[in-house]
From Swiss-Prot:
Family to which the UniProt record says this protein belongs: Belongs to the glycosyl hydrolase 22 family.
Superkingdom, taxonomy of origin: Eukaryota
Binding partners and assembly: Monomer.
Cited InterPro entries: Glyco_hydro_22 (IPR001916), Glyco_hydro_22_CS (IPR019799), Glyco_hydro_22_lys (IPR000974), Lysozyme-like_dom_sf (IPR023346)
UniProt: Ca(2+) binding residues: 82, 85, 87, 90-91
Substrates-to-products reaction catalysed: Hydrolysis of (1->4)-beta-linkages between N-acetylmuramic acid and N-acetyl-D-glucosamine residues in a peptidoglycan and between N-acetyl-D-glucosamine residues in chitodextrins
Gene3D superfamilies the record matches: 1.10.530.10
Catalytic residues (UniProt): 35, 53
Top enzyme category: hydrolase
Entry-linked CDD domains: LYZ_C
SMART domains xref list: LYZ1
Name the UniProt record assigns to this protein: Lysozyme C, milk isozyme
Coiled-coil parts of chain: none
Amino acid sequence: KIFSKCELARKLKSMGMDGFHGYSLANWVCMAEYESNFNTQAFNGRNSNGSSDYGIFQLNSKWWCKSNSHSSANACNIMCSKFLDDNIDDDIACAKRVVKDPNGMSAWVAWVKHCKGKDLSKYLASCNL
């Protein structure tokens, strides 16, 4: 499934992500845009450490989920393949776990590069949230 920006914003808001650990809704949506282009089936198997990234938030198999190809800390206690389906409830639950670590949203390189410290005040203006 490919979400629209506003559709994802509404979903994230309904799951309590606006202000979660101090990050505005716009930060979460911006991160998803640059990580996956809002695509729940996004997959990147080309990380230098042999790990892969899964789903709309590009959750990494070395730390957050279990894949069959290598060992994992599996901090979200889930199979990585679950992050590739249309239901993003489990992806959101795992993102909440990720952001509780000291790095916060800096765990996402695309967020650091494209969203961190930027003026996102108008980012969701058209969504009528």
